Each structure stands twice: as C-alpha cells, then as structure tokens.
C-alpha cells in the first residue's frame, strides 16, 4: 500500500468549537464516505499547561502566546465552568490525510478562510483583538475552531505529544513503540531513573512507550543531549 494511503494527521476540536456545538458538523466534514479517512484514535483531553506550552512551542515569545495557552486550555470560553474545559483530540488515517484535512479546515485566519473558501470549517471562526495592560491594541488571536497537522513531521510530533501508544490500536499505530524495562520519575522539571522524595513514577517496567520518547529518557538519565524537550515526554502523562 502506498505510504500516502496510510498517512496520519492530528485534529484538535478546540474549546470554541465545543462552546458553539460544532462537533457534529466538524466530524461530518471528515466523514469516511466523503474523504476515505478513518479514525485511528479519539479522546477527550483536559489540557494541562505543559501540554499547551509544548503544542504551541513555536509561538513562545510572541505577543499572543499567553492568550493562546488560555484559549487551548478552555479558560477563555469556559471561565466559570472548569469541567467543560477540554479538547477533542483525533487521529485520522488514510489517503493524503494531511492535505485533505487542511483543505477542509481552510486558512488558519477565519477572515481569510471566509474570503477564500466560505464553506470551510474555519470560516465559522472569529478573530479576537488583543490589548496590552494599558489598553493598547497589540494584534489579533485567531479563534479558528480546529487544529490540523501541517505536514508529516508535525503530525508525528503532535500525535506522540497528545497520545500514548496504548491510546491507538496496534494495527493503525503509525510510529514504533517499545516496552519499558526501567522506572522513570519526575519532579519539578527533572526526570530521574531513581526515586527522589516528592517525585512520581510516570513510566515503569511493562509500560508501552513511544520509541523516540524512550530514547530521550535514556539521553536525560545519561546526561546526553536530548533529541527534544523533557516537556514533550512528560506532557501526556
């Protein structure tokens, strides 16, 4: 089977889409009947700060970064309803999944999405003006309802960030995993292979872990340069 026919993409149905009861509409746009795409995995996630920071790491330092973290964590759309602060995370798999999904979603800016493709999902989104503490306009934040992986490299990083291997049936798991033989503990931003008072065990012998995550954990405990951040491993636990 050609590789593009087994392509995977992460989709996040964001809090503004949930607030506006657009979940059913969004899922219908990706229906297998129309796209040939299938669910590989789906879960509802209460987004912690580490997960939000890692997902939007490329935007760190930008004027809208703090607002973006509050947005994806549901604080902006559910300020007084903590139980409703969640995201629906989905892995779609199938022919040209990344390209198909991004075309259905439309431009990341809702204004541009409406102008370019009025029927796309993000055409229903909004653009929110942002102001500094003195009330000065500093730019916009796009509340665009949905996230979709931009390319194959991003899809792999994002799927491994939002999902554990055990969240995905083996027959549709796109990336290699391995069974841990060691314990790993976490406390205050640090990972160790031995228990430290106040730390907690997040991986133990017998746990199925992404192979790339295991490599990073071994790099950490051996004091070697990491392939990617500790946060990217910890955020999903």
Task: List each model region and its residues.
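Non-catalytic terminal and connector segments of soluble metabolic enzymes
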Residues: 1-237
């Amino acid at each position: 089977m050609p590789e593009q026919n087994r392509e995977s993409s992460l989709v996040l149905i964001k809090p503004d889409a949930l607030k506006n009861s657009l979940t059913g509409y969004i899922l219908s746009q990706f229906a297998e009947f129309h796209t040939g795409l299938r669910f590989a995995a789906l879960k509802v996630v209460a987004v912690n700060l580490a997960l939000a920071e890692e997902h939007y790491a490329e935007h760190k330092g930008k004027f809208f970064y703090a607002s973006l973290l509050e947005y994806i964590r549901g604080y902006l759309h559910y300020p007084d309803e903590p139980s409703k602060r969640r995201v629906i995370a989905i892995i779609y798999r199938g022919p040209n999944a990344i390209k198909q999904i991004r075309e259905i979603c439309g431009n990341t800016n809702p204004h541009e999405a409406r102008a370019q493709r009025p029927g796309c999902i993000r055409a229903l989104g909004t653009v929110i003006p942002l102001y500094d503490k003195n009330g000065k306009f500093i730019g916009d934040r796009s509340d665009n309802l949905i996230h979709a992986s931009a390319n194959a490299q991003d899809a792999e990083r994002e799927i491994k960030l939002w999902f554990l291997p055990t969240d995905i049936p083996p027959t549709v798991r796109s990336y290699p995993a391995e069974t841990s033989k060691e314990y790993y503990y976490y406390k205050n931003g640090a990972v160790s292979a031995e228990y430290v008072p106040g730390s907690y065990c997040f991986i133990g012998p017998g746990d199925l872990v992404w192979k790339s995550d295991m490599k990073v954990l071994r790099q950490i405990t051996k004091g070697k340069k990491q392939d990617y951040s500790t946060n990217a491993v910890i955020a999903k636990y």
